[in-house]
Amino acid sequence: LNKLTILVVLLFFFSPHLLAQRSTKDSLRVADSIKTADYDIFRIKKSYLLNITSDTSDINDWIWNDKRNLAEILFEKPGYLINYTGYGGLTVISDFQSGYLNSGISIFKDGIQLSNFNSFTDIENFSVNEISEIEEISEISSPVYGYSVNNKIINIISKDNYLPYLSAQLRYTQDRNDALYGDFYFNFPLSRKVNVLFGLGNNGYEGAYQNSDMSLWRFRTRVNWYVSKSLNFKFDFNYAKLERSLNDGLNNSTSDTLLDPIFARVVSTDLYDKNNNLFLNLNIKLIPPSLKTLLTDINLSAQNYFREYRFGEKNLLPDTSKYFTNLHTIVYSFDARQYFFIDKSKNANINILVGTNFSFIPQNKSSVYIYKNNVISSVENSTREPFALYSRLNAGFNNFNFSAGIRGENSGGNNNLFSFAEADYTARLNESDFIKFYSGINYYFYRNIPQYAVEYSLVNSPAPTPYVDCYFSKGISLSYNPVYFDLKLYNYITDGDINFAKAFSTSAGFRTKYFNGNFSFETSSLSFMPDYIFKSDIYYHNLLFDNHLDFRTGFNIKYMPKWKPPSYNSATLTFSYSESNPEIDYFNMDFYVAGRIGKANVAFTFANLFNKLNYTTSIFPFDNRGGLANALARFSITWDFKY
């Protein structure tokens, strides 16, 4: 009843404005109407892309079928698998095309590395409403940009609008089990040279099972000072506070008694953690007035993470054990990049990047174990000072593109050297149709990452041993209106042993006036991954009511055959793979209805239509379950305001 009341109030509040939107001046095909105007003439219009030739996704890729976080957004795209650990949990995004057992992607935000420093990144620190674009760096070239990056990099490009008027955006989502999510985004222009961006979000969840509630607050602000067309300053402040109960999954992981949550007994009823994450960054961009082909980009950042983990704290029985840990990590970083843009002619250009990273990372971990009258405590302090130099070259001539790069780093006393090269050639048939051939290879020399999964572990890793490995891929893309097709083959070699030799990824689709379809099929030869993943999204779209409603409705399907997903340990934040894990398959079908009218996007999702019991982590089922009566999983609205 409470959820229905909130929905009615929202619709009542918004409906007069919806009906009042009679102008066709707005582009209804644009899902996010807050766009940058010519007002910001002093801004250096160089984005936060790590590489100007990267593939990017924008809000149109996730606003229509109502994705709640970064993991759900990427799970729709080829190449990604998520290990779900409950609503608001530390869900991990894996690179399905990686040859490494440690396959978690590396996350950057506006060009700054966030993951791999404190060994994990909680995706709940990011709001969907703050994301403008998502940059994907290829597996071939990703390691050139960050410390210990052995898989694909995802770079979140946050919204950075600069408009001559006060503007705001509200995103509200309502989910099952009293899950409510709201996020506000504001733009305050103070002058043609100064503006302030502000965001505030809250996410609350009562939980489908015992001890599964969570509460999350996010706050972010950004101050832009455009001193001149040659010098820009940007200051970011982000803070996230997350409290969540940790039930460690369900005991009856393969039983269908989840139709009634009463019979779904959780592993733990007295376990929780509290997380505080603070991020500060000062960005300086400089283009010398006399040298427009140069761009200097400097970031001074600090990340402060504190976690409290509590087991047995509320249990008053004398013969029960208790375990408390605190983890505190601070990352001070200096990043400097120098870009050289050389345009030889209209069809020939060269871009060169030279950069350096230096970080100082103190970490403190304390723990207390109590059983009866015995108390065991420990304190661990450590410090890391990784340093790296790197460079990348991009060259384009007509339809041929070439890229190469090298990175040397010292981390924890280990020296690593990485290099890569990739190229592509596009044969254009006409303005819209083409055939593209691409290939790439990279090499790691004396890499300091153990082959086995330790990225999300807080415990000491095994001592690394020097070795050489490489990753190479080749593929072809075809676009012939209205269809497109892509086929990619890739191999992974470690010390001469091919352990990922027969993997491939293919995607295809069609785009017509009223119907679109996207399909992908990928294989893996690694035992801890499914043999293959099939994904599809088929939808109908049209402009209705005299072009005032941009309407879309479709089906979203995912299937993975029987496999043994990993177990998750919330104490050490570790994923482990075992032959004893239950073997399951995954099948999910969602139906969604969405539309944009005036300044608002509205979406409804009917989730898991076949009521399938799905897992991507061995004992954590997806919460989108409950039969036909509970099929309407989510409602969301994204509303733009202009004052």
Predicted segments, located by residue:
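Coil residues (strongly favoring Ser/Thr
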Residues: 26-27, 32-33, 41, 53-56, ...
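Periplasmic plug
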Residues: 46-54, 93-140
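A beta-strand signature from Gram-negative outer-membrane beta-barrel systems
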Residues: 125-171
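Transmembrane beta-barrel wall of Gram-negative outer-membrane proteins
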Residues: 180-204, 210-244, 273-282
